[in-house]
Amino acid sequence: MPYPVGQTTGLVGLAVCNTPHERLRILYTKILDVLEEIPKNAAYRKYTEQITNEKLAMVKAEPDVKKLEDQLQGGQLEEVILQAEHELNLARKMKEWKLWEPLVEEPPADQWKWPI
């Protein structure tokens, strides 16, 4: 359900999205596509995939903008879209960084000891 023309989010620098459901479906699908390239046993994939699938199901099930905002609990849908864009960028970086692989070298023995 598109917002009425001329309505504002009330947040500086955050424009109204006229098709928030479509935009969120696209973003969540892209996130899931990137996650499929990460090993299934990686913690990041496991938990991000679960959360993203839950959010995608909410977007598909709830056509009302206000009700969806309440269900997602992330503010206005434009804010949720921004969060999803950030998550997509992070997923791509996690894939690039390959954090699931073992360390190249062992960390120093007292690396986390404080005070030194």
UniProtKB/Swiss-Prot annotation:
The answer on whether this UniProt entry bears the keyword Cell membrane reads no
User: Any one cellular component term from GO for this entry?
Assistant: mitochondrial inner membrane
Topology with regard to the membrane? Peripheral membrane protein
Q: Name one Pfam family in it.
A: ETC_C1_NDUFA5
* The keyword Membrane appears for this protein: yes
Keywords of this entry: Acetylation, Electron transport, Membrane, Mitochondrion, Mitochondrion inner membrane, Respiratory chain, Transport
Q: Which GO terms describe its biological process?
A: respiratory electron transport chain
Which positions bear N6-acetyllysine? 30, 46, 60, 98
Residues bearing N6-succinyllysine are: 98
**Source species, domain of life:** Eukaryota
**Which InterPro entries does UniProt cross-reference here?**
NDUFA5
Question: Where does the record say this protein resides?
Answer: Mitochondrion inner membrane
Q: How does it assemble?
A: Complex I is composed of 45 different subunits.
Role this protein plays: Accessory subunit of the mitochondrial membrane respiratory chain NADH dehydrogenase (Complex I), that is believed not to be involved in catalysis. Complex I functions in the transfer of electrons from NADH to the respiratory chain. The immediate electron acceptor for the enzyme is believed to be ubiquinone.
Give the family, as the similarity comment puts it. Belongs to the complex I NDUFA5 subunit family.
> Under what name is this protein listed?
NADH dehydrogenase [ubiquinone] 1 alpha subcomplex subunit 5
Look up and give the organism this protein is from: Pongo abelii
